[in-house]
């Protein structure tokens, strides 16, 4: 299974916010299989999309060397379902960033209309217990970041481009 819950980033400002797009398709197995005969994109996958965008926003602050994991869904509110053919626009903002974890708040719009509010808490597994833990194979992680267009749209707060993952 491929772990893409967003299709691409449209904006990415280091340490501030990111916006991303997901085009819901009947070709997505989860859309058709989750509720046979009544296809829709599950809310849990929308949370996963927000977590993917937020986790990368956080991990980029450490040049993608951290082990950022979703720790808790602080709150989520969904107003209607996402259906095949809909475009979901994610916006995630970094609210609080500490060495051990971070908080993000986000919104999702479906075809321009507010579809969800989601607030997430992430943990950063950065102590010696996790030194040998690798969450992603480095080449596959680099491939994922490039496919999501992060380096095409990503900028630092001063407007300079975010550099590629040469160190991985």
Regions found by a protein language model. Give the residues of each.
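N-terminal structural module
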Residues: 1-31
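Surface-exposed, gly/pro-biased binding rims or lids
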Residues: 121-164
């Amino acid at each position: 299974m491929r772990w893409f819950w967003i299709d691409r980033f449209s904006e990415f400002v280091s340490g501030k916010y990111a916006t991303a797009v997901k085009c819901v398709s009947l070709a997505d197995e989860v859309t058709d299989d989750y509720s046979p005969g009544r296809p829709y994109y599950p809310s849990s996958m929308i949370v996963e999309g927000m977590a993917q965008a937020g986790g990368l926003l956080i991990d980029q602050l450490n040049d993608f060397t951290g082990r950022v994991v979703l720790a808790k869904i602080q709150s989520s509110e969904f107003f209607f379902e996402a259906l095949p053919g809909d475009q979901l626009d994610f916006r995630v903002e970094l609210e609080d960033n500490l060495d051990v974890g971070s908080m993000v708040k986000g919104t999702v719009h479906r075809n321009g209309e507010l579809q969800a509010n989601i607030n997430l808490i992430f943990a950063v597994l950065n102590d010696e217990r996790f030194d040998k833990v690798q969450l992603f194979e480095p080449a596959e992680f680099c491939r994922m970041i490039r496919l999501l267009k992060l380096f095409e749209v990503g900028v630092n707060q001063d407007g300079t481009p975010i550099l590629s993952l040469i160190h991985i």
